[in-house]
Regions:
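Conserved S-adenosyl-L-methionine
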Residues: 214-224
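A short glycine-rich, Lys/Arg-flanked "PGG" loop and its adjoining helix->strand segment in the class I
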Residues: 122-134
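Class I SAM-dependent methyltransferase SAM/SAH-binding core
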Residues: 45, 51-96
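Short alpha-helix
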Residues: 195-212
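Conserved class I S-adenosyl-L-methionine
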Residues: 1-39, 57, 139-171
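A short acidic, Gly/Pro-enriched loop at the edge of an enzyme's catalytic core
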Residues: 99-107
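A short SAM/SAH-binding and catalytic strip from SAM-dependent methyltransferases
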Residues: 106-120
Length: 257
């Protein structure tokens, strides 16, 4: 989705977007940030801040906060949602963060690296690394492609229980999971004119390492099963998830054109 698409949905964000800040979501990012030693003296950036869901939390815990987004309407909503004096708002594409080179102790990115171009994804991750001071930390949430496959497997088994014909069960599962909307090699989901990136864990690790991040640790943001999705029948199964990733840069990262 481009800046204009995000501009259009800014006023109805929670109607359009499933976020890790909604009720019943198990989001380890918040506890991680809360437990950082010396956070009161740190400068943190929220890259792709959207309407500012995380900003009040950050402003109350860190010395200074820089909120970055390429959507003017998202930034306007973020400013309304967070009026703390230690927050600076900047309209900037994540593909060029050279203005912030080496300025941050910590960056968070919450489902913000969604570009369908792998070249753009790699560029954003390099730019993100370059904003960090030596030893600086990335704490990011990224949509999981394995979670899509996991849900598909559950749906297939459900359909098999309802049918003696395995091929018919597979066709039903494919329809329910919108198989035609996914590119499982590139890790892309398409809906109408919008395309977005999802990540395999092995792929995300590799891309972050190439961007300059080290000491990577993976966890999960867990989403509840929703009845309106038709998946309440899986409520006893492990939840769907996004990836929660932590990593650091060992030294200052050069800016890449």
């Amino acid at each position: 989705m481009d800046a204009q698409a995000w501009d259009r949905i800014a006023g109805a964000y929670f109607d359009e977007i499933s976020t890790p800040f909604q009720a019943e979501v198990v989001n380890p990012l918040l506890d991680y940030l809360d437990g950082l030693p010396g956070r009161e003296e740190l400068t943190i950036a929220d890259l792709g801040c959207g309407i500012g869901n995380l900003l009040p939390f950050l402003a109350e815990r860190f010395k200074s906060v820089v909120a970055v987004d390429f959507s003017a309407n998202m930034l306007r909503a973020a400013q309304e949602n967070c009026t703390h004096e230690n927050v600076q708002f900047c309209r900037q594409s994540l593909t060029d963060l050279s203005v912030f080179q080496g300025q941050f102790d910590l960056v968070v990115t919450v489902n913000s690296v969604l570009a369908p171009s792998l070249n753009v994804v790699d560029q954003i991750l390099r730019e993100t690394a370059a904003t960090l001071r030596p030893g600086g930390i990335l704490a990011g949430i990224f949509p999981s492609m394995e979670s899509v496959l996991y849900e598909g497997g559950l749906i297939l088994d459900w359909e098999r229980q309802r049918s003696d014909n395995e091929e018919q069960a597979l066709r039903r599962a494919q329809r329910r999971t919108k198989r035609g909307s996914y590119d499982f090699i590139a890790g892309l989901y398409t809906e109408g004119e919008d395309r977005q990136k999802l990540y395999y864990s092995f792929e995300l690790r590799r891309r972050l390492q190439k961007a300059g991040f080290r000491g990577l640790q993976f966890g999960k943001v867990l989403y509840p099963w929703h009845e309106e999705d038709g998946n309440v029948r899986f409520s006893s199964e492990p939840r769907l998830w996004d990836w929660f990733v932590r990593g650091s840069v060992a030294s200052g990262q050069p800016h890449h054109d």
